Amino acid sequence: MVASTGTRGALQATGDSTGRSSGSFILPLLFLSFILPVYFQLAGLQLSGYRMVLLIFFVPAMIRWFDGSGGYYAPDYLILGFAFWTVLAIVFHHGFSRWEYNGIAFVEATGPYFIARWLIRDERAFRAFVRWMFIAVLLMLPFSVNQFISNNSVLLDLFSKVGTTYPIIPLEPRLGFFRAQGPMPHPILYGVFCSVAFSLVWYVLGNDRSFTYKVSRSGGVVLATFVSLSAGAWLAIVVQLGLMTWKNVFAFLQKKWNMLLYMLGGLYLFLEIAADRPPAQLFAAYLTFKKSTAFNRINIFVYASDDVIRNPIFGLGFNPWTRPRWMLGSVDNFWLVIALRYGLPALIFLVAAIIVIYVILGRAQLPSRLENYRLGYLFSLTGFCIAAVTVHVWDATLCLLMFLLGAGLWMVNAKEESDQPQSEMKQSDRRRIRYTRFGPEDT
């Protein structure tokens, strides 16, 4: 489902200017709030900086979606379906006793998505989004490097003097260094958050720039991701690098992405037949720092999947999932958590939205300048989605995913800002110019 010609006209007439004027302060406000570690309690709600921003701009964003100025796309309805099903699942299991969780969960699932749909409707707004995400990563970087070396969380210590902050997670060193948590609740969340910027910085901010420029900027993102010492975050970077390499090596092939999908599908079938355990377990076993972690993830997948099969419609809510007593209750797989907590319909809604985004953007006929924008966007989204198989994401990192999903749909009907037909420009010039005996009035 794509926007009609009339909708595109309305977008050009009103949406762009509105998006630019609003985005001039909402985008930096949102991304700076993502990296603020302070929160407070109000009427049973845990409110942080980014949650306040989402609550303030949720209604305006929905109004801008309802007026049709940005068009209507299938992922819009699928994201709404995902959010409504999560609420329904919690009400099914716990009644309205979890009303505060349901309210915040609904806003975190839909707010970032529809704010992105409202604000990002052209190339300029998309570039501003990437720039502010990059700035957020850079602002966290020196504090994270310091924690990586000294194990001192300057950010959390500093903000703890003015309010309640996330607790510092005591984790054992890796590779002789300490895991940087930044202003996030966990090093994993910090690392995954930073990793999303890699391809976007390379292809969007680095578009038409020198190789040195791209490496210097994207290198900062890699460093920020590295100091989290999170295998899941590193995986996101590796996936993006792999896709970038594939694109360059097989640039001469028209169907290179189809070939990659066929190869990955064939590899999965081969492992399913030839390996002594499911591919998902192999994936978990080899993408970890320690064998004990791999063993734990395999057991999580086995026991939690069984619970999903036994409770396919509404999941388990916040009820305990079946596991041995010696296992912790955390589930290091975002997609599995969605199915386990809310049921398979919630997972299907969310995954379907992502697949549809790939399909409609892959088929979009873009001007040559915007091809790199699409690559950066899809590569970053792919890295996030694959990393989410090995980690669970929540809080600001989850909101970043939802924002990212809504941030790329403008490209479906995008035109370069300089693509106005010459004939229209000439006609416009002729209408503006008024001649007198002294020459054109404009002179």
Give, region by region, the residue ranges found by the protein language model.
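N-terminal hydrophobic segments of proteins, predominantly signal-anchor/transmembrane helices
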Residues: R20-L42, R51-G111, L271, F384-A387, ...
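A membrane-periplasm/extracellular boundary helix in multi-pass inner-membrane enzymes
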Residues: P142, N146-N152, T245-T288, S305-R310, ...
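Alpha-helical transmembrane segments of multi-pass inner-membrane proteins
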Residues: V130-K247, V359-I360
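Membrane-interface helix-loop-helix junctions at transmembrane boundaries of multi-pass membrane enzymes
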Residues: G15-S22, M62-Y77, Y203-R217, N248-N258, ...
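Long extracytoplasmic/lumenal interhelical loops at the membrane interface
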Residues: R277-P345, I357, L361-R369
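Hydrophobic transmembrane alpha-helices and their immediate junctions
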Residues: F211-K214, V222, V238-N248, Y342-C385, ...
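Transmembrane alpha-helices of multi-pass inner-membrane enzymes
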Residues: I56, N258, G376-A387, H392-T443
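Interfacial loop-to-transmembrane-helix boundary motif in multi-pass membrane proteins
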Residues: S22-I26, A74-A83, A116-L158
